[in-house]
């Protein structure tokens, strides 16, 4: 018809008067391609966008779920066709060969394993993605097919067209790897359930989620592994996907326990006109040794076995960053002596010092107070003001002198600058409140001492 990309609309309409035209909207096109990328997760967890009109799917280890590569390819293209998305697809050992076959080969082409060279040999040179300059020059040299280019000496090809052309050849043939940017982290631990009829009832969603988790957990158990994060994705008829994520404090593969964690989160799934596919992914997969069952039924379970289910429920309800444990850290500076760790992390090498009581609540940064000292130089204040409220000191213990750790890198130079000596006091006011306050600096120096509050005792 004489139409080509980049042609003016007026010229195109002159050639084809009944041509249907629409305004070009790159942002909308990109959003649609990203939505299609998310939709393809039902076929593979590893999906990458290719340019403006293509997708790569790494189907390693997933084609058996459809009964083979051919059935998977037909299902993919037919589903897209039902949604009005015409597509060409192909399968090969390498991304480059699959790209060439999908765009220039026969429809629904599948290159047998290890035979990508023969599969693409008869395709035009444009199938190699060599770039516009090389694609324009090769036909002038009488090179029209991929096989002709493959027959050239590598040195001659690199000299005339650059190393990028040789790299594209190697990527297509599998001699060089091709890095793909997947939309979500690729995971080989993937399984799926498809339904003859869409489902939407809450009890059905809970049941299929449990079934999908049972599938992936059975695979993990068969290979002696467990995982810390799981994701169940509900795929609607209209292409939208609703992921439900759960995490474990310890690696595990108990499908029933995971199903109990998923069930409260199913309220966020909007089934719409129905869910047609459920996929399940496992992340942070590690070896997991089988546990020896105890012969004495009354034996007390370990702390991990007792706490792990509770911690899992709290983490999945409140958020991963809201459930943690405070552990001691080897440091004299109070704000450096406590670190946040996972609730079931191994015990630390450092230990709490019972001879040095520390407040139940330690402030991240000390707060300034206005203090009136009773006696100098080593007595606590008899009155101090904090956050606009006055506190009269009734009892006090101290001082406990702490110096900055000059040997550590990154000592803050803020309100308690390096080299400053701190004298800490445990004080109680006339209402029973107990505070941890300190004096920064010494009397008689260049700068007047300052008073701070650093924590609260129970």
Curated annotation (Swiss-Prot):
InterPro entries: DNA/RNA_pol_sf, SulA_CellDiv_inhibitor, UmuC. The keyword DNA damage applies. This is Protein ImuB. Induction: Up-regulated in response to DNA damage in a RecA-dependent manner. GO terms for biological process: DNA repair. The keyword Cell division does not apply. It comes from Caulobacter vibrioides (strain NA1000 / CB15N) (Caulobacter crescentus). Keywords: DNA damage, DNA repair. Along with DnaE2 and ImuA is required for the error-prone processing of DNA lesions. The gene is imuB. Pfam families: IMS (PF00817).
